[in-house]
Amino acid sequence: MRKRMKRSSKNVFPLKIDELEQLMKSEFDKSPDLSFSKYEHQNKKIAVFFIPYQVQPDRVENLLLTPLLESKEEWSNTAILNKIPLNSGKEYQQMDEILPGLIAGKVMIYIEDEAAVVSYDFLNKEKRSLEGAETESVVIGPKIAFTESLVTNLNVIRWNIRTPDLAIEEITIGKRAPREVRLIYLKSLANDTDVDTMRQRLNELDVDNVEDSNVLMQYIEDDSASIFPQFHTTELPDRTSYAILKGKIAVLMENSPSALIAPSTFFSFFESTEDLYMRWNSGSPLRFIRFMSMFISVVLTPMYVAAVTFHYEIIPTQLLISIGQSRAGVPFPPVFEALFLELMIELLREAGARLPTKVGQTIGIVGGVVVGTAAVQAGITSNILIIFITISALASFTAPSYQMGTSIRLLRFPMIVLAGILGLIGIMFGLCMLIIHLLKMTSLGRPYLSPIYPIRFEDLNKALYRLPQNFQYKRFISLSLKDSIRFSKRNAKEKKDIDE
Amino acid sequence: MEINVKIKPNMRIQAFYLFFIIVSMQIGVGILGVPRLVFSEAKQDSWISILVAAAYVIIVLLAMLLILKQYDNADIHGIHRDIFGKWLGKIFSTVYILYFAIAFYSVLLTYIEVVKVFVFPDVSNFVMGLLLISLTIYGVLGGLRVIIGVSFVFGVLANWILFLLIHPALQIDFNHYLPLFQAPFVDLLKGARATSYTFMGFEILFLVYPFIQNKNKVRISSLLAVTWSSLLVLSATMLAIGFFSAEQLERREWAVLVLFKTQSFPFVERFDYIVVAELMMVVVPSLLFLMWGLTYSMKRVYKVKQKLTLYVAAIIFLIGTFFFEKHFETQRVINFAEQFGFWFIYVYPFVLLPLVLLKKRLKKRKGAGSS
C-alpha cells in the first residue's frame, strides 16, 4: 500500500497512451468499471477515461466528446481548456489527484505526450427529491426536510439565507473513505471562538470514516459519557437556518439528511420553530407544556412507585382506596410492575419504529389496547399504573428533538429503580444528580444550562418563554455574538394614550 | 503561599451569586429545629432574640468585609499568612479546615437524622451517607462554578415549599405572642446564642471573596443574603410559636417540619415526607460548599491536590457515619460544631480585625518612612 502511494504521488507524465491504459487498468484491477476509450484525431492519440455510472452520459457526449472529435484543429491541453469552456475544467498531473477525481465523477482527457491530464466535472449523484419532514413533523411553517445530497441541502440553506454574509467552509473528514463536511455560519454574527473551536474539532478529527452527522456529533461533542445530546441534530432546513440567523453554527455532511447545530443548550432542545410561527401568547404555553411534560415523564411513574411502596400516607384516603382496589390482585411489588409496563411501552415504540407504517399502527393497537386490557384482567398490573405509564410515555414524545426525547425516556428506568429502593429520597437523589450533571455539562465549551446558569435575564424570554416580537430586540447574550442587537428598540411601537 | 489570590478570568463570578451562596450555606437543616431552641430560652419574645442575632450577624459580616477590604484580593488563608506568619498562620488555617470538616459532618448527620425520624426509621446511616457523599463528590469534581450553579439552581427550586406554609400560617393563634417583652435581657441573649448554628455559613465569604468580579456589589449582595435568611428564620420561628402551644413546641424537635403536615390537597397529603425529600436540595449546596472549602483550603495551605483531599475526606466521612447512629451522638456532633463555630465565626473576626488594621497602619508608616 505504502509503495503504491509513493508511486502515485510521483509525476508520471508525459507518457504514451498505451502506458497510461496499462497504468489505469492496474489501478482499477479489482473493479472493472473504468471506461477507457482511445481516439485518433488529427494524427494525435487522445484518451478519454471515466467511470460511466458516476457521470451523466448524455452531457459527456454532447458537451465534451462531440466538440472534441468534430473539430478540425489540432488539440493540446490549453486548446481544450479554451475551446470547451465548462467551468470545472482543470489540469491534473499527479495520480493521487486523478484517482479520487475519477471516483468523484470527473471525466479525464489525455493527449499523448502532454504533461498533464485535463478533467471536467460531470458528477451524476443519485438523490431523492425534497420531501416533508418525517421525524420532526410540524403543524405550521415550512415542512421540507434535508435530503442525503449535500448540494441540495446547501441550495436550500442558501435560498433561506440570501446573503453573501453566509460563510460555508469546506472540510474533509475521514481517512479511508473521505466525506465532505460544511461549516456554515454568519460571518458578521457568529462568535469567532466558537467557530474556531468547531473548525478545530472537525479538522483534528482523526478517524477513518464517519457514517452520518449523528455519528459526527458523537465524535466532536464535549462529554461523550453523558446521556444528553450536546449538539442539536435536525432534519428541518427551516430550523437550521433559524439557528444560523441566531448566530449559531451549523454543520452539514455529505450523505446525511440531518444538520448539526452548535452550541446548543438544554432548553433549545425543547424549542420548536412552531413556537415562533404561533403568536407569543399561544407559543409560550406550548413551550411550557413541553418543559412540564419533560418533568412529568421523568418523575410521575417513580412518584407512584415511591408512594405505593413506602409512603402510602401521602396519598389521601379516597384515592388510596381506589389504588388499593386496583392493586389488590397484583402479586408483584410496584417496582417490578412499573418496570414491566415501561418495558412494554418501549417494546411497542421500538417495534413501531422498525415496522412499516401500516403494520406499525396495527401493532400499536394490538400491543396497547389488547395486551394492556389483558394484563389488567389477568391481574398482572393495575389500571392506575397503566394510566401513569401512558401519560409519562406520551409526555416524553413531546420533546421536539427525537434524541432528547429518547434520553428522557431512558432516564425513567434508573429513577424507577431508585424510587423502588429509597422512595422519595431516592427520587430526590436522582433529581439532584441530574441537575448537577446538567450544570457540569457544556456544549462547545458553553454552559449547557444557560441562560439559567449563568443567569442572563434578557435571554430568558427567548429560552423559556416568548414575549411579543418588539420585546425581542436582542439576540442571545449568552452566545456572546458579534452583534447582539436584532433591531433598534426605537423602531418598536410607541406607547399611545387612550384614543379619546 | 501568596497572600493575594490570582484568579483566572474564566473563574470569576458575579457578586449576584454571593446572595445564593450565603443563603444556601445559612439555610440548611438548622432552620427546622431553631424555633424550639430559641423558644426554650426567650419564650414568646423569641422574635427579639432573632432580631438581636440577625443584627449581630450583620455586624460580624461588616467586620469581615472590612478585613477583606484591607487587601487587594486575599482570602482568609492569605490573611492568616500575612498576620501570623508562616507557622502560626498555618495553625490558624488548619483550625479553619477542621471547622469545615466538622460543619460538613454535622450537616450530614442532621439530615440523616431528619430522614430517620420522618421517613425511614430503619434506614442505615451508611446508605444515606453514601447518597449524600456521592452527590458531594460528583458536585465538587465540577469545581467552584458548578457548586455555585448548584446553590443557585437548588436555591431557586427549593423555594416552592414556602408556599406550603401559607395554610398553617392562617391558623395562627395570636395570643401565643402575648404578653410582649416578658423575657429578661439575659434570656434574650441566650435565645440569640441558640440561633448561632442556624446562622452559620456566611464565613464562606472569607474563601470566595477573591473569586468575585465586581467587588463593589459584594456588600449589598451579602447583606441582602443575611437579611433574607434572618427573615426566613424569623418567620419560621414566629409560625411555630403561633401554631403550637408552649408545651407542644418544647416537645417537638423539628417543629417547622411538623407544620407541613397540616397542608393537604385532594391528591397529596402529608407534605412532611415531600419536604424532607426536598430538603436534600437545601442540604446538598451546604455540603458542596463545606467540602469545597475543605479541599480548597487544603490546596491553599498545604498544596494538596483537591481531588486527593476530596476522595480521602469522603471515605473518612463515610466510615464516620457508622459511629453516630444514635440521636444523642448526632446531637453531640451538632453541639460541638456549634461551640466550635460560635467562637470561630462570631468572635474570631473581631480579634482579626484590629490585628489587620494595625498591620496595615504599620506597613503604611514604614512605607512613608522609607520614602
Task: Give a label for each model feature.
Chain A
Residues 278, 282-285, 326, 352, ...:
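Membrane-interfacial loop-to-transmembrane-helix junctions in polytopic alpha-helical membrane proteins
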Residues 283, 321-333:
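Short aromatic-rich membrane-water interface segments that cap or initiate transmembrane helices
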Residues 311:
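Functional cleft and adjacent loop/helix regions within the main domain
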Residues 1-299, 314-317, 438-500:
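Membrane-embedded alpha-helical signal segments
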Residues 303-306, 316-319, 331-500:
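Generic detector of multi-pass transmembrane helix bundles and their immediately adjacent loops
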